[in-house]
Amino acid sequence: LSRTQRFNIRKIEETSIADALQRKYGVQPIDSQTIAHLANGNFIKALETIHLNEENELFFNLFISLMRLSYQRKIREMKQWSEQLAAMGRERQKNFLEYCQRMIRENFIYNLHRKEMNYMTLPEQNFATRFAPFVNERNVIGIMDELSEAQIHIEQNVNARMVFFDFSLKMIVLLKQ
């Protein structure tokens, strides 16, 4: 510790990030504002958001599919969903589980009606208007625990089909709480 020094670096203003995204990367003004808010003062995160749009869109669609299938208790389709995820590869599976954790957190906070605390894209916000009431103080901890457990199992090389099917079955119970 004798040769270390701490530097506090402040966040970059959202307007500065949005302007830079518009000028340097040709991002539309509305999109640049959303990306700047999602980046939370981190320009590198803003650039990653631009480049990871396709993967995030896939994860968003898979998340919606899981939540709808779990709510409707469609077991056969949930099995197909888990097989689709199992074919992705371990890193993408872990990224998907991290995305799910973020979405559960954002939907839980959405219930507080504090827009400045939410970091969701416009399609995610549209979905949250209908889905957020199902994420509440009775089930949010259980959902996050199951997501963490699934991520640990994926990291430990457990069969992905089993992990995701088990997780989807547990979501049936958790969403009804």
Regions found by a protein language model. Give the residues of each.
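Charged, glycine-rich active-site and insertion segments that engage polyanionic ligands
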Residues: 1-99, 103, 110-177
